[in-house]
Amino acid sequence: MSTSRLYTLVLVLQPQRVLLGMKKRGFGAGRWNGFGGKVQEGETIEDGAKRELLEESGLRVDTLHKVGHISFEFVGSPELMDVHIFSTDHVHGTPTESEEMRPQWFQLDQIPFADMWPDDSYWFPLLLQKKKFCGHFKFHGQDTILSYSLREVDEF
């Protein structure tokens, strides 16, 4: 029986561009990703998302929109990653490099999928179309998707 742990992921989407961060250390290092991490005990999922965005990019946000919910399974790991994905189009502050992430804006037609998690190319198009989605990805290592399911949903 697997256990799961709550994680958040925040994508700052503005007209024609998205803010991603180059992960500098730890799990997923060397890949572009949104901003997020583990939800702490006593913290709501949305509060955890706001905290992680601030810690990793220096940006504050008033409103987040839940757009996705994906569980990730890694062969050999007993823990599922239960990831709640949010988007926002309005932030306060200027993106600032942290110990963990180096933020950079990308034009929507220049998203660096080759340097991102392999699953991103499956669900990112739904995000960009402002659709909500749920899914599950099973990985072998960090590069190979063994199986997946992904579907659009109306609400959470």
Curated annotation (Swiss-Prot):
Domain of life: Eukaryota
Enzyme class: hydrolase
Binding site for 8-oxo-dGTP: 23
Hydrolase in keyword set: yes
Keywords per UniProt: Cytoplasm, Cytoplasmic vesicle, Hydrolase, Magnesium, Membrane, Metal-binding, Nucleus, RNA-binding
Cofactor binding, per record: Binds 2 Mg(2+) ion per subunit.
Reactions catalysed according to its record: 2-oxo-dATP + H2O = 2-oxo-dAMP + diphosphate + H(+); 2-oxo-ATP + H2O = 2-oxo-AMP + diphosphate + H(+); 8-oxo-dGTP + H2O = 8-oxo-dGMP + diphosphate + H(+); 8-oxo-dATP + H2O = 8-oxo-dAMP + diphosphate + H(+)
Residues noted as binding Mg(2+) 2 in the record, renumbered to the chain: 52, 55
Purpose: Oxidized purine nucleoside triphosphate hydrolase which is a prominent sanitizer of the oxidized nucleotide pool. Catalyzes the hydrolysis of 2-oxo-dATP (2-hydroxy-dATP) into 2-oxo-dAMP. Also has a significant hydrolase activity toward 2-oxo-ATP, 8-oxo-dGTP and 8-oxo-dATP. Through the hydrolysis of oxidized purine nucleoside triphosphates, prevents their incorporation into DNA and the subsequent transversions A:T to C:G and G:C to T:A. Also catalyzes the hydrolysis of methylated purine nucleoside triphosphate preventing their integration into DNA.
Protein name: Oxidized purine nucleoside triphosphate hydrolase
Natural source organism: Rattus norvegicus
